[in-house]
Amino acid sequence: MIVYLHGFDSNSPGNHEKVLQLQFIDPDVRFISYSTLHPRHDMQYLLKEVDKAIQQGGDEKSLICGVGLGGFWAERIGFLCGIRQVAFNPNLYPQENMSGKIDRPEEYIDIASKCIDGFREKNRDRCLVVLSRHDEMLDSQRTAGDLHPYYEIVWDDKQNHKFKDLSPHLQRIKAFKTLG
């Protein structure tokens, strides 16, 4: 089973396309939609829904995948739920770049500080990060610098921030998922 978390643009038709692409890895892809506007509520909701999906799915090698803001959540929720994660262009600093788009961007600082101390060290090698060299929204080099000590970084030379085409990375994701 693969859980898919959308980015800030929850209504983008690209989300459906990504789910269809992920079904080449596993036919059981669960799209979990969340508000994107209320970070604390989103975290509680996502924890509950992802845990429920894992319990119902019965796949010992479940995976959570997210793009942009969904990548922020995939890393944290996947860690807390004990499953591997794939993050495409994860937005690691929504408190800096989501002002005016969400009600309380400062809640992301609170969430980051309340996550288990050193969680990335404890999560080492359990997240695969795919970054676009042409991300028009985020500083990919900064993201790589923060995550490279803990996770494998895969660079993509064609996609932009929304990462419409996952297909060049599906085999790598499939291999990563089989590691459980």
Curated annotation (Swiss-Prot):
InterPro entries in the cross-refs: AB_hydrolase_fold, UPF0227, UPF0227/Esterase_YqiA
Domain of life of the organism encoding this protein: Bacteria
GO molecular function, one term: hydrolase activity, acting on ester bonds
A Pfam family assignment: UPF0227
GO CC annotation terms, alphabetical: cytosol
Protein name according to UniProt: UPF0227 protein YPO1616/y1776/YP_2238
Family label: Belongs to the UPF0227 family.
